[in-house]
Amino acid sequence: MSLQMLIKPEKLAFSIYRQFPKFKPRQFEEARRGDLERDFLFLLKKCISVNQLRQIQAQMLLHSVEKPNFLIPKAVELGDFNYSSFLFSVTEEPNHYSFNYMIRGLTNTWNDHEAALSLYRRMKFSGLKPDKFTYNFVFIACAKLEEIGVGRSVHSSLFKVGLERDVHINHSLIMMYAKCGQVGYARKLFDEITERDTVSWNSMISGYSEAGYAKDAMDLFRKMEEEGFEPDERTLVSMLGACSHLGDLRTGRLLEEMAITKKIGLSTFLGSKLISMYGKCGDLDSARRVFNQMIKKDRVAWTAMITVYSQNGKSSEAFKLFFEMEKTGVSPDAGTLSTVLSACGSVGALELGKQIETHASELSLQHNIYVATGLVDMYGKCGRVEEALRVFEAMPVKNEATWNAMITAYAHQGHAKEALLLFDRMSVPPSDITFIGVLSACVHAGLVHQGCRYFHEMSSMFGLVPKIEHYTNIIDLLSRAGMLDEAWEFMERFPGKPDEIMLAAILGACHKRKDVAIREKAMRMLMEMKEAKNAGNYVISSNVLADMKMWDESAKMRALMRDRGVVKTPGCSWIEIEGELMEFLAGSDYLQCGREDSGSLFDLLVEEMKRERYEFGYIHL
């Protein structure tokens, strides 16, 4: 006797209808037709939550319908990693459909790309042959991990199954090779596509943009238009990334106008890219305008605007927007929290940083590698090395940025020995950023020989090419040690053109050491730099000339500063009062501090100082 004869469809429909009140009776009339498996497939199509899916699974078990391959795609579609993994683990023989959905979920939804590749290998080991859908997501995973070796191996297997000419797979291959730094090969694949569509152009333009080949992306975009292809949202998003890289505000504005002309809606994806582009180009007003125009603002849009404020030194605005985001009910993710922590570190907002750590714990994000690295960086910049070390040691996984943050925290707080010991412990290959922290530690501690040794080890042991920041550190190290001749010789060895920061280190030492010959050469070089915008260098040079009783030359240096439009950046301080960050600028009035009562508070403080008989000069805030 069949299962269908034992259990009436009406009874099954009524049982599930009680738990699916949103399903209409008419839909169950349709569900009564056919066998039970078809009934369950019908219900799975209508399922809109994990809770409903669990109820369907319970009914399937109750009616002895063992079809876990039915459930896995819907669980992945609903985005529940734990439930999807459970269903997959209890499935004795997952089919193509289940493997493909799990690999897609791991790649696109859960960003566990290593697990996606592992599942691909398991699929092959089980005897199932990957198809074009499998390969697409495998190449995406390789791109995200920059696993060029695995990608090439999988690419070679396409020829065995006759998929080497599949257009959709080639699009994924272009992205993978570009992401892995093989831009030339990506372009070769693109040129071999005989019938290109918009997706083909987007793949190559996006590949160029993400790999940092912004000019090539621009050139290909123009060629795309010349050949009559209409750009879509993805095209504009990739081009906005290229504009950000080049700082090309004019083209960025034209792209926004193009989106309006072609009636490409301001989605959160496009809007967020516009915000980031305007932020990278320094146009904060336009970034905020786009943000305000967005009807639907998701977490990505909020984070993009907060990042713009943080990266442009507007920490107070970043904090305000973060609190506003939470009030609207949008929950922050690891990217949001790490951005806010960066803003906290830049202004020394320690108490707010502590609140963010508590908030991260509430969201179970305290061990997220980006959040934890942000905490290490924030505590280090706020002078709390012990707290930075606490977070660092508790991290289950550390990447290069984590080690760099802790080394830099030690270096900037004068703990050179600890910084160098930590560098020796480093379990991942160091980068040029790592050596900036290491050399900075040597500068703070006056470790001349060690600093020079680390500088040479960059290239001899680690194959890294020293950049201007590394040369500047060594010049600063030698200058502070009074080795001005050596510092000057070292600067002359720099393969590029010395900048004003290098000269600042030498001029500062000359001012203290009274080295006339070198300071004259340094000042002459500074005056020849038409692009020099560091006000401190002009002030130091003017003071040096004044010390030499060269009053006319000192005045000329100040005049040169004015002629070049160099303005001395006003002193700026921040203070946290009752959870509010107040900003004070030298020369500003009271109301710019963000509190109307700040002026009266300051007056009371002055009166209190008078009563305590403190001596002070004229103060103007």
UniProtKB/Swiss-Prot annotation:
UniProt-annotated stretches for the region Type E motif: 502-578
Q: Which sections of the protein are PPR repeats?
A: 95-130, 131-165, 166-196, 197-231, 232-266, 267-297, 298-332, 333-367, 368-398, 399-429, 431-461, 467-497
**UniProt key word Protein transport:** no
Q: Which Pfam families match?
A: E_motif, PPR, PPR_2
Which parts of the sequence are annotated with region: Type E(+) motif? 579-610
Q: Which UniProt keywords apply?
A: Repeat
Question: What residue intervals traverse the membrane?
Answer: none
Task: Extract the GO molecular function terms from the UniProt entry.
Answer: RNA binding
Disulfide-bonded cysteine pairs: these are none
**Could you confirm whether the keyword Repeat appears in this record?**
yes
GO BP of this protein: RNA modification
Which family is this protein grouped under? Belongs to the PPR family. PCMP-E subfamily.
Q: What is this protein called?
A: Pentatricopeptide repeat-containing protein At2g34400
List the source organism: Arabidopsis thaliana (Mouse-ear cress)
The uppermost taxa in this organism's lineage are: Eukaryota, Viridiplantae, Streptophyta, Embryophyta, Tracheophyta
The UniProt gene name for this protein comes to PCMP-E23
